[in-house]
Amino acid sequence: MSEKYLIFGATGSVGSNLAEQLKNSGYDPHLVARNENEVKTISDKLDCTYTVADVLEDGFIEKIKTDINDIKGIAYCIGSIDLKPLRMISEQDLNKCMKLNLYSAVEAIKGYQESLK
């Protein structure tokens, strides 16, 4: 069995290209994305597994772990920035940005830390 790698943000250009490179190198990517139609299309093309999950929702790691437990690595290819003047940025904007770009990545690593040792 080839080594499994979780690819978060697998429907974006970085995530989908990384998944394709891993597959072509003999690894087994497991795709994670929030849009089922898009992730299924990529999964079918690469012949790999996937989970539909939104990293902004509580319990997203538990949802993914129902599909895959043992992994070799994680690629967190999710990111966004809210470009607007500082005077217009609210605390809610900052919290959402931190949750998407940092906290969810930390949760993913924590959720799979035993497998990653």
Kindly give the residue locations of the regions a language model identified.
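Conserved Rossmann-fold cofactor-binding substructure of NAD(P)-dependent oxidoreductases
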Residues: 56-70
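A short, exposed helix-loop element centered on a Lys and neighboring polar residues
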Residues: 109-110
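Rossmann-fold cofactor-recognition segment
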Residues: 43-59
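Conserved glycine-rich Rossmann-like NAD(P)H-binding loop of the short-chain dehydrogenase/reductase
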Residues: 25-39
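N-terminal Rossmann NAD(P)H-binding glycine-rich loop of SDR-like oxidoreductase domains
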Residues: 8-20
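Conserved NAD(P)H cofactor-binding loop of Rossmann-fold oxidoreductase domains
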Residues: 77-83
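Substrate-binding pocket helix/loop in short-chain dehydrogenase/reductase
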Residues: 85-86, 93-98
